[in-house]
C-alpha cells in the first residue's frame, strides 16, 4: 500500500484545477508510484503542466499575424452566447431559414449565386467532392501535379479525394501544366471534375506555366463537367482599401470574387485566414450545387454553431460597410512602421534594459503568402539567462509569446494590439 493517500496527494499542491481532475491524476500516479516524495513530484509536474495549458488569451509578439498555433485570425468576440434567432424568423414568429441574413450578406460580398458555411475549409472540399460523386455521378478529380498540396496537420489533398470515393487524376508536371493536359485527361475521363488548388503555403518559380481559371472555364463549357477552385486563403478585401494603405503584397493573390467571375462553379476558402474571421469554411458558387450540398445527408455534421455564424456575419458586414480597419486582422496588417516604432519606445520608456530596435520582417502566416513579408520595427532584448526569461514570459498573466532572434528575445508589435502594450511594459519592468 502507498504511504500517502489520494486525498493527501490532492491537497499537497494549491493548484486551482477542479478537485475531480486532481483526484483522477492522484489515483493514476499512486497506482504505479509508491514513494510519497516521488508521487508528490510527479503530481506537482502533471497538475502544473495541465493548469498552464488551459486555453487562455495570450499576447502574440511573434510578428506572425495569422499564427496557426495561436488560433490564426484574431476575432473580437461580441456574441454573448445567449439565445439567438439562428433558425427563427422574427418577421413571422415561426421557424425560418438558417442564417438567412448571413447568406444574403455573403452572397452580396462575393457576388455569388449561393453560399454555404461549414466548420473548416477541408470540410468544404470534402463535402463538395462527395456531393459531386454521389449526386452528380462524377467519379474522378483532375488536378495539376503542381497543386497536389499538403497543409498543416498532415492534411494531404490525395487523402481527401480518396476519402470521397473519387479517383485522383494528375496532369502536367510539378512546374508546368498546360490547358491541353486537362483537355486530354477529360477525353479519357469524361466523368471527371476539374479542381484548381491555390498554392497558398508554397510557391513554384522559374521555368513555370500554369492554367488560369478563365482557361479552365472555357474548357469546362465544352465538356459535361464542373470547375472547383479551392482558394484556401480567401482574399475578398477591396483593392481600394489595399491602395489606400499602400499594401502591395496581395497583388498576385487571387480574389474570391474574381474566381467566380472567371467561371468557377464553386469557390471555397477558410474563414480564419485572409478573410479575417473565425474558423470556418465558406463555399460559394452555383446555386444548384450549393443546394445539393446543403441537402446532402451529412451536411448537418459539418455545419457551424451560432457563435461561428454570428462572427462571420459581423465580419461580412464590416466588408460591406467598407470598415475593413475594424477587422482585427486588417487592423494589425495596416499599421505603419513609424507608429509601431513609437509604441516600442513608449513600452521601453526610461528603463535601462540592454536592448535595441532593429528592422525585422513580419509575416502573414496561416499558410498564406509564403514569399511576402512586412517591414516592422523589432525590440530585441539582451538578457543573461534567456531560458529563464522565456519561461517567465510563458507563465506571465497573460502569457506573452515572443521569438528568439540571434540569442536575444524579440518582440514584434505587428501582431500585438495596442491595448496589450501595457502588459509587455509591465513584464519588462518586472525582470
Locations of regions flagged by a protein language model:
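Long amphipathic N-terminal alpha/beta scaffold segment
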Residues: 37-75, 104
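Conserved C-terminal alpha-helix-loop-beta "cap" of PLP-dependent enzymes
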Residues: 341-419
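Glycine-rich phosphate-binding segment of PLP-dependent enzymes
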Residues: 26-27, 31, 61-62, 71-93
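Conserved PLP-enzyme active-site core in the AAT-like
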Residues: 93-316
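Structural motif of enzymes handling amino- and sulfur-group chemistry
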Residues: 288, 296-297, 304-351, 358-361, ...
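A short linear hydrophobic-aromatic micro-motif
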Residues: 54-55, 116, 398-403
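Short Gly/Ser/Thr- and Asp/Glu-enriched loop/turn motifs at secondary-structure junctions
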Residues: 4, 59-63, 274-278, 374, ...
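Long amphipathic alpha-helical segments
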Residues: 1-48
Amino acid at each position: 500500500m502507498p504511504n500517502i493517500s489520494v486525498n493527501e496527494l490532492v491537497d499537497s499542491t494549491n493548484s486551482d484545477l477542479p478537485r475531480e481532475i486532481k483526484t483522477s491524476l492522484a489515483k493514476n500516479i499512486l497506482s504505479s508510484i509508491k514513494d510519497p516524495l516521488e508521487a508528490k513530484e510527479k503530481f506537482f509536474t502533471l497538475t502544473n503542466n495541465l493548469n498552464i495549458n488551459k486555453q487562455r488569451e495570450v499576447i502574440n509578439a511573434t510578428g506572425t499575424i495569422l499564427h496557426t498555433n495561436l488560433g490564426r485570425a484574431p476575432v473580437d468576440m461580441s456574441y454573448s452566447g445567449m439565445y439567438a434567432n439562428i433558425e427563427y424568423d422574427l418577421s413571422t414568429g415561426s421557424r425560418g431559414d438558417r442564417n438567412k441574413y448571413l447568406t444574403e450578406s455573403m452572397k452580396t460580398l462575393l457576388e455569388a449565386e449561393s453560399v454555404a458555411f461549414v466548420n473548416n475549409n477541408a470540410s468544404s472540399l470534402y463535402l463538395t467532392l462527395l456531393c459531386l460523386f454521389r449526386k452528380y455521378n462524377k467519379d474522378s478529380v483532375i488536378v495539376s501535379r503542381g497543386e497536389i498540396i499538403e497543409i498543416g496537420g498532415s492534411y494531404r489533398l490525395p487523402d481527401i479525394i480518396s476519402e470521397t470515393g473519387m479517383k485522383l487524376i494528375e496532369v502536367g508536371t510539378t512546374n508546368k501544366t498546360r490547358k491541353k493536359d486537362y483537355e486530354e485527361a477529360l477525353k479519357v475521363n469524361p466523368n471527371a471534375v476539374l479542381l484548381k488548388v491555390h498554392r497558398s503555403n508554397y510557391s513554384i518559380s522559374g521555368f513555370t506555366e500554369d492554367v488560369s481559371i478563365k482557361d479552365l472555364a472555357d474548357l469546362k463549357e465544352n465538356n459535361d463537367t464542373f470547375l472547383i477552385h479551392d482558394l484556401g486563403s480567401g482574399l475578398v478585401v477591396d483593392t481600394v482599401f489595399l491602395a489606400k494603405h499602400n499594401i502591395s503584397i496581395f497583388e498576385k493573390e487571387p480574389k474570391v470574387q474574381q474566381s467566380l467571375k472567371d467561371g468557377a462553379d464553386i469557390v471555397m476558402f477558410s474563414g480564419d485566414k485572409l478573410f479575417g474571421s473565425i474558423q470556418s469554411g465558406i463555399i460559394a458558387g452555383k446555386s444548384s450545387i450549393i443546394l445539393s450540398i446543403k441537402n446532402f445527408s451529412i451536411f448537418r455534421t459539418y455545419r457551424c454553431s451560432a457563435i461561428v455564424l454570428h462572427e462571420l456575419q459581423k465580419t461580412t458586414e464590416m466588408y460591406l460597410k467598407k470598415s475593413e480597419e475594424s477587422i482585427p486582422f486588417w487592423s494589425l496588417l495596416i499599421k505603419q512602421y513609424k507608429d509601431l516604432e513609437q509604441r516600442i519606445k513608449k513600452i521601453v520608456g526610461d528603463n535601462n534594459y540592454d536592448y535595441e530596435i532593429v528592422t525585422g520582417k513580419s509575416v502573414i502566416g496561416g499558410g498564406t503568402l509564403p514569399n511576402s513579408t512586412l517591414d516592422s520595427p523589432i525590440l530585441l532584448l539582451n538578457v543573461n539567462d534567456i531560458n529563464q526569461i522565456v519561461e517567465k514570459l510563458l507563465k506571465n498573466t497573460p502569457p506573452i509569446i515572443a521569438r528568439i532572434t540571434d540569442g536575444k528575445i524579440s518582440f514584434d508589435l505587428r501582431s500585438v494590439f495596442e491595448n496589450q502594450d501595457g502588459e509587455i511594459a509591465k513584464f519588462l519592468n518586472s525582470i
